Amino acid sequence: MKTSVLFVIFGLALLFCLSFAAELEDTGRQCGEFMWKCGAGKPTCCSGYDCSPTWKWCVLKSPGRR
């Protein structure tokens, strides 16, 4: 029982560390990808994406958008 609890705790700690590292990698980007927060104080959207005025995240460009 103690061993399985330790495995669960170490597994959760590993998952937390990996997600934190992925988040650091995302914040290091120069531009925002799909569903990335954009707007004032945030990085601009990458080419091929526009900042949605309603939701304030990067969405794919469509022919009807300006």
UniProtKB/Swiss-Prot annotation:
It comes from the Eukaryota. It is found in: Secreted. Expressed by the venom gland. It holds the Pfam family Toxin_12. Disulfide bonds join C31-C46, C38-C51, C45-C58. Residues 22-29 form a propeptide. Residues 1-21 form the signal peptide. Keywords: Disulfide bond, Ion channel impairing toxin, Knottin, Secreted, Signal, Toxin. Its main location: secreted. GO terms for molecular function: ion channel inhibitor activity; toxin activity. GO terms for cellular component: extracellular region. Probable ion channel inhibitor. The presence of a 'disulfide through disulfide knot' structurally defines this protein as a knottin. Belongs to the neurotoxin 10 (Hwtx-1) family. 29 (Jztx-13) subfamily. This is U10-theraphotoxin-Cg1a 1. It comes from Chilobrachys guangxiensis (Chinese earth tiger tarantula).
